[in-house]
Amino acid sequence: MSILSRVSDRRPDLSLVSEEDFPYEQDIVRNPGSTKPWLAYIEYKLQKGTVQEQAYIMERACVQLPRSYKLWKMYLRFRTKHVSKLNAAIFASEYQKVNSLFERALILLNKMPRIWEMYLKFLMQQPLVTHTRRTFDRALRALPITQHNRIWALYRPFANSAEGETAVKIWRRYMQVHPEDAEDFIELLVAVGLYTEAVHKYIEILNNPRFTSKNSKGHYELWSEMVDLLVEHATAVETGHETGIDVERIIRSGIERFADQRGKLWCGLATYWIRRGSFERARDVFEEGITTVMTVRDFTLVFDSYTEFEESIISALMEMASTRAEKGEVDEVADFDLDIRMMRFEHLMDRRPFLLNDVLLRQNPNNVTEWEKRVALWGDNKEEVVKTYLDAIEAIQPKKAVGALHQLWTNYAKFYEAGGDLSSARRIMEKAVKVPYKSVAELADMWIEWAEMELRNECFDEAMKVMAKAVQAPKRSTVDYFDETLSPQQRVHKSWKLWSFYVDLVESVSSLDETRKVYERIFELRIATPQTVVNYANLLEEHKYFEESFKIYERGLDLFSYPVAFELWNLYLTKAVDRKISIERLRDLFEQAVEDCPPKFAKVIYLMYGNLEEERGLARHAMRIYERATRAVADEDRADMFNFYITKSASNFGLPSTRPIYERAIAALPDAEARDMCLKFADMEKRLGEIDRARAIYGHASQFCDPRTNPGFWTKWDQFEVQHGNEDTYKEMLRIKRSVQAQYNTDVNFIASQALARSQQKRMEEEAAGNGGGEMDAEVADAMAQLERQARAPVGFVAASEGPKGGSMPVQPVEVHNPDAIDLDEMDE
């Protein structure tokens, strides 16, 4: 270290130059202004020389060529590396020598940022805060502004490590050139307790529309951080005209702007005043908050904070009162203040349901349900109840009402009715029926409520007058009930609900003639419903006006078409048949009923018609009607109709009479139903002993029955031939069976249906036996392969007997059982 000291003294030390160095020394002498020989000399010494020799050569080089950046950089790096392992506090003198070396270099190289960076990094290793800060400032002054970022990259960490006032001053300078890092500066200001300046910085960046947070914070988030700072350090932040900080104004501006954060901001403003000791102002803020917030969430937040604030004050006052009691002191003013605060707190808790209701009504003053709840909250307080009803009526816009507005008016009138003031209730009802409700139905309900009120008070004449006024309309009204451009008052006279109540009222308290007039008026206005027709007809029937009753049904049938007309015809025909009017007239009615009747509804009417002919007419006429019915009914009812027709024909004219019916049924019905009909037909012929006819029917039905999917049919035919046939007929049956099977095998659709039937049958058998699914899949695959082989086989001559021909093995068809098949033998038994 002493040698390095001598080197720094710039005195030549020839002992550090050896004979081997002469070539380099001579080269230096020959080229005194060039750095190349010096660099070669230094390179040589770095490989062969000692540390002292290396330092000596570098020192000489920098003295001879003081403007060489390369030589100085090499020398400075060499010296800083040499002392870097030493403790800067203990070896401060050694560090100071290197500092002096940097100062020498900067005399001529003060525009070199790399030299400054090396010097500043070296200084930051030493406990020289002031000197380091001044050196940073010198670097900023010496270098052009385009290179300041390199210095600030070191200056900022130094400032943060220095902390305190030093850091703040450095950051203030940094903010002048890099305002985008304001958030970091604010963190520093908060950390050192300069809250007022931090708030000013927040205000500055919030007022700058070009500011973009490097932490991706939005405008609200920054503003919220500022508010939290103001509230948390309420006493430390300087406010007033001098500082330009008005906390209440700032927070209130946020309450107006950020609607979804009002509860939090009201609590924040109140907390601010609490921390500043202004309890009354805090209470005023809480009161304003709970009476202005728009959501239940915000209300709950503010109200809970309010109650917590009051409880804390009361708790503190009670502790003080307890302390006074222990000491035996009496302070009437303090005790009175405690009593007042407790009463105020109880009043606040009592107000909670009303305040909550206010919140919901502020959200939507047209909410009828909430107004009803408010009325219920007042209970027996009649003055407040009336005031609430008046406020509701004034606040609610009828066209925007949510809920049953007419019910609010009704309850208002009932309030006076319950108090015995019927005249006031009537005045309310008179006003209520003039309100432009959203729908005619509400107005109709209002009129009905008025009439019911009169009925409850046994004022029947008044009720009649009310309803007569409600349905009052021009003689020939052309108003469209569904025309929304007209007011409900202009359309209410066509309200079916209103007329229905009116007719019930007239029917119960007035004469038949008056009731008929009301019904006739309903028909004139063309608002009658099927129920109106039925009620009117029943009324006349009860009073023995049977023919008039029938006329009403006919008028109803003129008004309504099917399907409504079906119900009216059903009632009308039933009443007419029960009345036992002339058979000719009944026939005319039934003919009218079935004339335009859709197939869907024809079955019932035809059955009634046929039953009439059976009971009061001729059986032959009934059969003709049933025959017509088989053509008129819907497809899904046709098979049932044929079966009914066959049953009636057999009971009236014997089994042979059913043959043409069976034949027409087989021709008219689809294949599946025709097959069942053939089986019944064949069974009937068998019972009559017509074996050949039965066999012919089986032969005809065979074309509908694939042996693989309909084995039940072939089983029955087989049993039939066994019982009644011979070898020839049995062979013929087998021939037909093979022929049909071959026919179906050529149809891809039938092949698919056969495979499906087989798979379903196998699945059912395996489920019954508890077998696994693997065997079922194998058998289904085998069945499908067999079907494919049969489908590919050529269709040729069909032999009359079964058996192996030409050495080929017969294919045994897999028998499929139909779980839905009907055993006709059991049915016959």
UniProtKB/Swiss-Prot annotation:
Subcellular location: Nucleus
Keyword Repeat: yes
Disordered, as annotated region: 799-829
General function of this protein: Involved in pre-mRNA splicing and cell cycle progression.
UniProt GO BP: generation of catalytic spliceosome for first transesterification step; mRNA splicing, via spliceosome
Similarity comment text for this entry: Belongs to the crooked-neck family.
GO CC entries: post-mRNA release spliceosomal complex; Prp19 complex; U2-type catalytic step 2 spliceosome
Name of this protein: Pre-mRNA-splicing factor syf1
Recorded superkingdom: Eukaryota
Species, as recorded: Neurospora crassa (strain ATCC 24698 / 74-OR23-1A / CBS 708.71 / DSM 1257 / FGSC 987)
Main location group: nucleus
InterPro entries for the chain: HAT, HAT_Syf1-like_N, HAT_Syf1_central, HAT_Syf1_CNRKL1_C, Syf1-like, TPR-like_helical_dom_sf
Keyword Nucleus: yes
Ranges occupied by HAT repeats: 15-47, 49-81, 93-125, 127-161, 163-182, 277-312, 380-418, 420-456, 473-505, 544-578, 581-615, 689-723
Pfam family, one: HAT_Syf1_M
Keywords annotated in UniProt: mRNA processing, mRNA splicing, Nucleus, Repeat, Spliceosome
